[in-house]
Amino acid sequence: MPNLKDLKNRIESVKSTRKITKAMQMVAAAKLRRAQDAAEASRPYTERFNAVLAGLAASVGDSDSGPRLLVGTGSDQTHLLVVMTAERGLCGGFNSSIAKLARAHAEKLVAQGKTVKILTVGKKGREQLKRDLSKHFIGHVDLSEVKRVSYDNAADIAADVLGRFDAGEFDVATIFFNRFQSVISQIPTAQQIIPASFEGDADADATLYDYEPSEEAILADLLPRGVATQIFAALLENGASEQGARMSAMDNATRNAGDMIERLTIEYNRSRQAVITNELIEIISGAEAL
């Protein structure tokens, strides 16, 4: 029979844990509102910016004279994977889903004889990938001291990536992140950013504009900003996804703690009842002996 004192201590311990998970759920809910607003506010700008770039790119075509960020290096031998995860855990499968997608992509490329390099953003992704892919690591971006992600953070990451591209360190760059859909749904996403790959259709009005000095010159100026914009959008999507996943995980943890408290309380009451029954039997047996 379980010790009553041990059961009582376990109940108090689970109650204490439930208070913590409930508090974390409430904090995540408050942060989620801000993060979701930021992610949703960035989407129209990002989509429009990409549409303009896509229109310009369509005008340039596959000309070899186009910017390298658009036409590429002429090879796809070396791939840079920018894996964006959280600095903290306790957010369900948020980090593992991104790491799983990046790992599968890296293994596929290696099987094809490609060279893979990995730049991690966020501690948790680095921890999950280092066991199998540490030899491919070339850098890490620490955002643990950043309370709210800004465009400057994205611009710094973009500058690092672009610097490596200009130095000839890779041919293709892909970012990995979670796209926010809802509190209970975040979609692991792989998005190529170099050479430029635009989502959606090109700007339908692009052919109505005359560009000076030329489409190539304008693209050469806008494409680096496009890389930073896509990275910033990914960081915002990741931020909203992280808080949504943490809120959901802490809600589940709080519910599970409540269920455990209920089970332990029933077990405690049954054990206490058994102790009282045994004591009564002993008293009655003693009285009969007299």
UniProtKB/Swiss-Prot annotation:
| Taxonomic lineage | Bacteria, Pseudomonadati, Pseudomonadota, Alphaproteobacteria, Rhodobacterales
Q: Please provide the record's keywords in A-Z order.
A: ATP synthesis, Cell inner membrane, Cell membrane, CF(1), Hydrogen ion transport, Ion transport, Membrane, Transport
Q: What GO molecular function terms would the record report?
A: ATP binding; proton-transporting ATP synthase activity, rotational mechanism
Q: According to its UniProt record, where is this protein located?
A: Cell inner membrane
Q: Which InterPro entries match?
A: ATP_synth_F1_ATPase_gsu, ATP_synth_F1_gsu, ATP_synth_F1_gsu_CS
**What membrane topology does the UniProt entry give?**
Peripheral membrane protein
Q: Under which name does UniProt file this protein?
A: ATP synthase gamma chain
Q: Does the keyword Cell inner membrane apply?
A: yes
Question: Pfam families from the entry?
Answer: ATP-synt
Identify the coding gene: atpG
Main localization category: membrane
State what this protein does: Produces ATP from ADP in the presence of a proton gradient across the membrane. The gamma chain is believed to be important in regulating ATPase activity and the flow of protons through the CF(0) complex.
Quaternary arrangement and interactors, per the entry?
F-type ATPases have 2 components, CF(1) - the catalytic core - and CF(0) - the membrane proton channel. CF(1) has five subunits: alpha(3), beta(3), gamma(1), delta(1), epsilon(1). CF(0) has three main subunits: a, b and c.
Family annotation (CDD domains): F1-ATPase_gamma
**Which NCBIfam families has this protein been placed in?**
ATPsyn_F1gamma, PRK05621.1-4
What's an example GO cellular component term for this entry?
proton-transporting ATP synthase complex
The protein's matches in PROSITE patterns, at most eight in alphabetical order, are given as: ATPASE_GAMMA
* Sequence similarity: Belongs to the ATPase gamma chain family.
Annotated GO biological processes are: proton motive force-driven plasma membrane ATP synthesis
